[in-house]
Amino acid sequence: MSAAIDAVELSRELIRKPSVTPADEGAMDVVERTLAGLGFACRRMRFGEIENLYARYGTARPNLCFAGHTDVVPVGDAAAWSKDAFAADVVDGVLIGRGAVDMKSAIAAFAAAAAEAIAAGRVTGSVSFLITGDEEGVATHGTKKVVEALLAEGEAIDHCVVGEPTSAESFGDMVKVGRRGSINAEILVEGIQGHVAYPHRAANPVPVLVRLLAALQDRALDEGYPEFQPSNLEVTMIDVPNTATNVIPGTAKARLNIRFNPNHTGQALADWIAAEARKAADGFKGKVTVTPQISGEAFLTERGPFTELVAAAVKDVTGAEPELSTSGGTSDARFIRALCPVVEVGLVGRTMHQVDERAPVDEIRRLQAVYAAIIARYFA
């Protein structure tokens, strides 16, 4: 019989490892030791400087996977915290620490739920964990690489639960069944620097950049898509490195981000930005360079038995139906969708990445109960 796991104490042990991306600081060792103690076959997968772990209990199908990350964002102003960000103090029933919400407590909760299911003999197929140390960073050597390796090896994962903090206002009020895609673009306009009194001897990059950004901003990308918000474009930076009042600058730069629904693909949007750049630069003596970076495509896990199972498990614990949503930012679910249908369910995300990130202890235990209900229903 497997040993019981205290989800709160395991959360605290993980938080005490200051695993700010890309550092691991022993966090993955804690997860591996815990799962190995339950009888999981654990496999460390290191890509670059990033530690990853794939662990599986059982060899039969179906294989229900939990995906999460041990890395966390920086603390910020440590003096602004009421407690040490990595001390994992519990104050008035609330666990305070970086990773309490996003998302070390979810890893601990699913490990505790898995231990419970294994002890009760409920796992008639397999339960697995896909844990990375590269979700909060550039995410190139984490889940993406692990998924590519598992696909190449023919590892079968049938469904996946991601432990991101999906609850919006109250515990269990929201489950994520998809995500919008994301593309960043850097635009560099290179002109010819010169004196403002002699514009014919220069090529001002600023009007070109302004025309381009206006054209991009003025277009309504769409009016939404079933289950999705309308796509939106946001200019995130404009830089003209010129402090003189009598000089036409030589360069102008901007960055933008588009969060898009399935009406678009990242490549189609990159092509559109490039086409608009060519129009804005018509007759310009300089050069316009657009550098796009597609972070992920929009995806949706269609409503069906798996989404219904997860929603029912949440209702088992909260008594209320959760909203099935595609709102918010990107997550590693965008990579896992290549393996299997994926749903995200976790704690309330209100304090993630903030000073005094915190999670009520009772909500960590309720999350364990939700995960236990998912496992029980899955193998029923």
UniProtKB/Swiss-Prot annotation:
What cofactor requirement does the entry state? Zn(2+); Co(2+)
- Gene3D superfamilies linked to this entry: Zn peptidases (3.40.630.10)
Tell me which UniProt keywords the record has, alphabetically.
Answer: Amino-acid biosynthesis, Cobalt, Diaminopimelate biosynthesis, Hydrolase, Lysine biosynthesis, Metal-binding, Zinc
Q: How is the cofactor bound?
A: Binds 2 Zn(2+) or Co(2+) ions per subunit.
Keyword Transferase among UniProt keywords: no
Q: Could you describe the subunit structure of this protein?
A: Homodimer.
Output this protein's name. Answer: Succinyl-diaminopimelate desuccinylase
- Name the gene that codes for it: dapE
